Regions:
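Short, acidic Ser/Thr/Gly-rich low-complexity loop/linker segments typical of extracellular
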Residues: 375-396, 415
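Beta-strand-rich domain onsets/edges
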Residues: 245, 329, 334-355, 426-429, ...
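Cleavable N-terminal signal peptides of Sec/SRP-targeted secreted and luminal proteins
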Residues: 1-20
């Protein structure tokens, strides 16, 4: 009992410090702003022909993106998806042969960096990747093919406020991890397995709105503090902060219906990386990751993660990439990280052109928008764009596509996926008024509840639908048990990554 009381005291104290983060951020930001002009490691010369291997603060990042946009107007577009707590833009740069206009039949992917402000390697790698793509478009056949057939959206910093108070050389700890209100943005999304009561934060809300507007097919979130590619689910039906502590040495996987695809995507990144596939263990308390990949919940479960949200609510396959054992390594090590990750990033992005893609049209050849689709026996769905387009990453094999839309007869189509290129599949739906007409077949699949494109996993379906039925806003965290829970979550995050 004495040990338990001591542990609770430590956790409550830790949570008090966490809740005070916003005040420390404000003071730190003023100090850093005063020193930034004299800081040699935060430098960007917009007249330079290439990006230096240094860390770039918000102002320098903004200048860099604007400069690249002006230099390469035919390959880049710059937009903001919203603002941080302290008013910084969440900049996104599109790199594509068609940066301003949608390319019919061409998929959108996104790469997000710096969701934790003190995990900074990914932020800088994305700036270098932007430069690499635009500078090699004319000379590199692979790069040209990728940009001609894909629209790539880069969000270098999802947590610019947190970055401004982080310190170079701090390999562990939480300073700068959270946003300016002291919230972990990777715990701030809707969760499939558990009601998430965290107060909504503007950075996470901006990403949710972004995902709702663009049908992303593939995504990665870049982190630091470990060296591993992690894939959904991040949470489990029985997840708890206590379980996270005890499962960190090798917990129970929480697998998606697309587990084969997620493992493939993760291993594609790992095997093309300089070191990741060796299963490097960064800290004494962390696992050895076989082949450099792990199921998120098997590592440690968390509630409100971004990759699970993308998969369940966005129909987008996202993995989490932990790129460095040190969260904020010295800038002198950035060239090494770039060499280790460049090919992995390129290979990963090209995986969007695997599986099946096509159009859903009606009998008059008009696109069917927001038709709900799923691969039979894989009960997490996706939907068509306003142009009737769809994409799904799949490994070679034979599959059946189930298609549903309001006012149309449901349809089931069998197809085959091969290794070399995506399968092109066009589906025609017939109006339900033609039911019973000769030559128009029906399937036994019926839409039941208006959310048929949502996932249905037997082990968690009841709890999920209970969550969906709630109509009242989620209350903010409060009370001693919430404090204990938050304390455990933050303790686990800072220890394990």
């Amino acid at each position: 009992m004495r040990v338990l009381l001591t542990l609770l005291t430590i956790l409550l104290t830790s949570n008090t410090l966490i809740n005070g983060t916003a005040h420390r951020i404000h003071l730190h930001r003023q100090t850093r702003a005063q020193q930034s002009s004299a800081s040699s490691r935060l430098s960007y010369d917009e007249t330079s022909t290439s990006l230096d291997f240094n860390y770039h603060n918000y102002e320098q990042l903004t200048k860099y993106l604007r400069t690249m946009n002006s230099r390469y107007p035919n390959l880049t577009a710059l937009y903001s998806i919203g603002k941080s707590v302290q008013g910084r833009d969440l900049w996104v740069m599109v790199v594509s042969a068609s940066p301003y206009e949608h390319m019919l039949g061409k998929p959108n992917i996104k790469i997000v960096g710096n969701i934790h402000g003190n995990e900074v390697v990914g932020r800088e790698l994305l700036l270098h990747l932007i430069e690499y793509l635009v500078e090699n478009y004319q000379s590199d056949k692979f790069v040209k093919w990728l940009l001609d057939n894909t629209r790539i959206h880069f969000l270098p910093s999802m947590n610019p406020d947190g970055f401004e108070v982080s310190k170079e050389g701090m390999c562990e700890g939480g300073q700068g991890r959270y946003n300016a209100r002291g919230f972990d943005l990777n715990r701030n999304f809707p969760d499939y397995f558990k009601q998430n009561n965290k107060r909504a934060q503007p950075e996470a809300e901006a990403v949710k709105e972004w995902v709702s507007k663009i049908q992303f097919v593939l995504s990665a979130s870049l982190h630091g503090g470990a060296l591993v590619a992690s894939y959904p689910f991040d949470n489990t039906p029985n997840a708890s902060p206590w379980g996270a502590v005890f499962q960190a040495y090798g917990g129970t996987p929480s697998l998606t219906p697309d587990d084969d695809v997620f493992k493939h995507l993760s291993y594609t990144y790992s095997k093309n990386h300089g070191k990741m596939s060796k299963g490097v263990s960064c800290k004494r308390v962390t696992n050895h990751f076989e082949n450099g990949i792990t199921n998120g919940a098997a590592w440690y479960p968390l509630t409100g993660g971004m990759q699970d949200f993308n998969y369940v609510w966005g129909g987008c396959m996202e993995i989490t990439l932990e790129l460095s054992c040190c969260k904020y390594p010295p800038a002198s090590e950035l060239p090494k990280y770039w060499e280790d990750n460049r090919n992995s990033l390129l290979k990963f992005m090209s995986e969007v052109h695997r599986g099946v893609q096509g159009f859903v049209m009606d009998e008059n050849n008009n696109p069917v928008e927001k038709a709900a689709l799923k691969i039979k026996s894989r009960d997490v769905g996706f939907q068509t764009t306003k142009y009737g387009e769809f994409w799904r990453i799949l490994l070679p094999g034979v599959y059946k596509l189930e298609v549903y839309a309001d006012g149309y007869l449901p349809k089931e189509v069998e197809f085959m996926v091969i290794e070399k290129h995506p399968t092109l599949l066009n589906v025609t739906l017939f109006s339900s008024k033609y039911s019973g007409r000769p030559g128009v077949s029906q399937t036994n699949n019926k839409r039941n509840d208006g959310v048929y494109y949502r996932p249905h996993i037997p082990s968690a379906s009841q709890q999920y639908h209970q969550h969906q039925a709630l109509s009242v806003p989620n209350p903010p965290d409060s009370g001693i048990f919430s404090s204990i829970s938050n304390g455990f979550s933050n303790l686990v995050s800072n220890i394990f990554g």
